[in-house]
């Protein structure tokens, strides 16, 4: 049953992302992007193996969206745990602890950004990925199903998580 809910959540997120992208329309190229580095923050959808495995097929035959974009520019993106610049971790929430699986050691997106900013800065040709919120929604729905929160409170928590993510994005620009 939880799998069906997760599948629906992923489909809604994918459709919303596609609609947002389609709304951008077309444009002309002023100057071609030539990125030096790819840096990522987020949850399972952006995780490239922070804890040893990814939230996809792990035989190397499938790349997630960050790996696909980096490869289009002849670059790679690897987890911080392996010396790279992808801070994203599966089950990470935006600011709340523990993560959606109950692991208090998983860095929140806020903590991921804190770690990067404590040891580095963005360059003019860096590409930054940030994707989060699914784990917050899953935790909220689990609380509703467990009877520990109301649907209205879950919606309010989701709105707050969205505002917290916007705050983190503003730190990056």
What are these regions (language model features)?
Residues 7-16:
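Sec-dependent N-terminal signal peptides
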Residues 17-18, 53:
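Alpha-helical transmembrane segments and their juxtamembrane interfaces
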Residues 2-5, 24-173:
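Conserved active-site regions of diverse hydrolases
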